[in-house]
Structures are given as C-alpha cells and as structure tokens.
C-alpha cells in the first residue's frame, strides 16, 4: 500500500508539473489547436501536434488519406465522447489514466519475470517518471498501447497465450508496431517444438495468429475503402496505406532522416538510444523481449523520425528494467535528475511547437 501511495503522489505531481508548464509556455506559431478550441486555453495548449489529428478524426472519422498515419481505432473510440471538447478531455484522461495503469501492470510483469518485489516497485516508479513526459498526458496513443503491451506480455509470461494474443492484437489497433509483439510467440513456439509440448504449441500458435490477424485487419480496412480506385499504393506488392502515407507525407524511409538539419533530432534521441543500447541483455529468458527492443531501436535510427524514440519506447519493459537497475545503484539519483531535466525541456519545446515530437 505504501508503494502504491508513493506512485500516486509522484504520478499526480508529475502530471500537474507538466500541464502547468504546457500552459505557460509562450504561444506556438501553429494555430491548429487555437482554431479547434478558441475559447479553451487548457485544451488549446494540450491538443497540439498529433493530438489535433486524433481529435479532428474523432469528430468526423478519417476523411483524408494522410490521416491513416494515425490510429483509426483510437479516433473512433474517442468519437463516442460526443462533442469536440469532450473528445479532447477524454483523450487526455484516458492517456493519463492508462499511464498509471501501465505502471502498475509493468510492476506485475516485472515481478513475474524477476521474482523481485523491490525491483518491480522501482521499475514502476521509473515508468511514472518516464522520459516520454508530456506525451503520456496529451491524448496520444502511447499510454494505452503500453498498457495493452504490458498486459499481454504478463499474460504470455503466465502461459495464457490465446488471451495474451488477443490483448497484444488489440494493441495493433492503436499502433502498427504492435505486430512486433508477435515475435515472442515465435520464440515460444520454437521452445514448445524443442520440448515436444504439443498443447502448448497449439496455444502459442493461436495467440500469435491473433496478433497477426488483427494487424492484417488494420491493413485491410483502408484497402477496402480506397482500392482499387486509388492506384499507387493499392498496386504495391504489400498494399499498406500506413507505409505509403508515412513515406509520402512524413518522408519516412531508410536513411531519409539522415540529413544535416536533423542532427538536433538525433541529439534529442541520443540519451534514450544510449540507455536502450546499454540495457541489451543476452539472458536466454529475456531474448524475446530484447529482440523487439533491438528492432524498435534500429528502426528509429535508420527508418523513422529518430526523436520519437522517447515516446514509442514507453512500451518496452526492457528499457525501464535497465533504468530501475541504474536507479537502485550508487549513482541512481543521476537517472532521476536526467529525466526531470529532460521532461522539463521536452514540454517547453513541445508546447512551443518545436521538436522533439
């Protein structure tokens, strides 16, 4: 109970601090949020960047092709809230609450993996202090995606593969990289085959298939809407609208981000990338986790907008295990100081509509 109380106090303090900073940052040059909420300063300062797309799409569903870069399911779910203001408040509330629940689920997952209650509690606390900062407040999908990820991984850890697959499959409705959670099932299947565990193998196949099936549905849905009338990506060998709009509208692709003007973004990402690199482990029982960890890190460096690593890494328990290990060490206070300085800098830049975002 004492640890839970500590988590709640730190959680509320961090959220209040980030929101207060966002409200006092000098007004950004982009007016999208002001046009959406001309008479609501709170929402006009928090619903910016990607949140603008989520709220707009929630009001009228996905209308334009480029909006499919943002979760269709998240927008549809938010749309149930009704009015524009209600949608925005709901997004912020769900994002914030999911952050807390994700920390609690990460604690359960960590204790299940390491059988160390104190380490699990430290991991949960580090997750509350996450470098993702304002992105776990402002109505993005990261918090809920992380909650589903940790829940699914916990169920997998307990051998409940079909249920784990259903939960991790649901994460694919929020973010395409949820497909990567199918990788641990491949390791589990190999283990089941090696040890002649037929029933376990069948259970693993069902769970992994659910992840793949939901991901394929997220690709089929826009294809059924736009194709075959929309040439171009409809005729690709793998007709994925997400990959197409990311490449066309956001210039995502191999080494496309490696330009001189993006050097600051690489510097923004460097601390988290360094922590991810240092945290790598060859412990056989952890290899499935670290395989996903490594793929996401490499994809961010070579394929995606590298600065997003600070927020999309929130689904990686491996990163927070390492941060918890550092926090329990002799110089653990340096980790906490780094996070506090970083999230302060981050929210000021984000609120002024400047990278990293």
UniProtKB/Swiss-Prot annotation:
Annotated pathway: Glycolipid biosynthesis; glycosylphosphatidylinositol-anchor biosynthesis
Superkingdom field: Eukaryota
Main location: endoplasmic reticulum
GO BP annotation list: GPI anchor biosynthetic process
UniProt topology in membrane: Multi-pass membrane protein
Broad enzyme group: transferase
Any one GO MF annotation of this record: alpha-1,6-mannosyltransferase activity
GO cellular component: endoplasmic reticulum membrane; mannosyltransferase complex
Compartmental location: Endoplasmic reticulum membrane
EC number: 2.4.1.-
Pfam annotation, one family: Mannosyl_trans2
InterPro entries cross-referenced by the UniProt entry: PIG-V/Gpi18 (IPR007315)
TM ranges: 6-26, 86-106, 128-148, 167-187, 201-221, 257-277, 286-306, 334-354
Disulfide bridge positions per record: none
Alphabetized UniProt keyword annotations: Endoplasmic reticulum, Glycosyltransferase, GPI-anchor biosynthesis, Membrane, Transferase, Transmembrane, Transmembrane helix
Family: Belongs to the PIGV family.
Function, in words: Mannosyltransferase involved in glycosylphosphatidylinositol-anchor biosynthesis. Transfers the second mannose to the glycosylphosphatidylinositol during GPI precursor assembly.
Name of this chain's protein: GPI mannosyltransferase 2
Taxonomic path: Eukaryota, Fungi, Dikarya, Ascomycota, Saccharomycotina
Protein encoded by which gene: GPI18
């Amino acid at each position: 109970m004492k640890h839970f109380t500590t988590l709640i106090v730190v959680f509320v303090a961090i959220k209040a601090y980030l929101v207060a900073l966002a409200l006092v940052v000098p007004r950004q040059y982009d007016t999208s949020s002001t046009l959406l909420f001309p008479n609501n300063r709170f929402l006009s300062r928090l619903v910016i960047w990607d949140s603008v797309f989520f709220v707009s799409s929630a009001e009228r569903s996905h209308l334009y092709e480029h909006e499919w870069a943002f979760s269709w399911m998240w927008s549809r779910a938010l749309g149930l809230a009704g009015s524009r203001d209600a949608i925005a408040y709901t997004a912020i509330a769900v994002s914030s609450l999911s952050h807390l629940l994700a920390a609690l689920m990460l604690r359960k997952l960590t204790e299940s993996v390491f059988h160390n209650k104190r380490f699990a509690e430290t991991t949960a606390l580090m997750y509350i202090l996450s470098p993702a900062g304002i992105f776990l407040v402002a109505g993005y999908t990261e918090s809920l995606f992380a909650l589903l990820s940790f829940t699914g991984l916990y169920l997998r850890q307990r051998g409940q593969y079909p249920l784990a697959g259903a939960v991790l499959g649901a994460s694919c409705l929020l973010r395409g990289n949820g497909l990567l959670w199918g990788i641990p099932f491949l390791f589990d299947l190999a283990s089941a085959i090696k040890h002649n565990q037929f029933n376990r193998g069948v259970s693993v196949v069902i769970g992994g298939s659910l992840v793949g099936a939901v991901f394929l549905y997220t690709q089929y849905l826009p294809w059924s809407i736009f194709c075959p009338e929309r040439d171009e990506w409809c005729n690709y060998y793998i007709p994925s609208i997400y990959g197409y709009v990311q490449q066309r509208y956001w210039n995502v692709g191999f080494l496309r981000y490696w330009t001189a003007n993006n050097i600051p973004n690489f510097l923004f990402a460097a601390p988290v990338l360094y922590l991810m690199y240092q945290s790598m482990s060859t412990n056989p029982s952890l290899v499935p986790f670290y395989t996903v960890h490594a793929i996401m890190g490499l994809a961010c460096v070579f394929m995606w907008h590298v600065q997003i690593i600070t927020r999309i890494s929130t689904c990686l328990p491996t990163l927070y295990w390492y941060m918890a290990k550092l926090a329990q060490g002799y110089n653990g206070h340096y980790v906490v100081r780094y996070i506090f300085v970083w999230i302060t800098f981050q929210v000021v830049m984000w609120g002024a509509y400047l990278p990293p975002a």
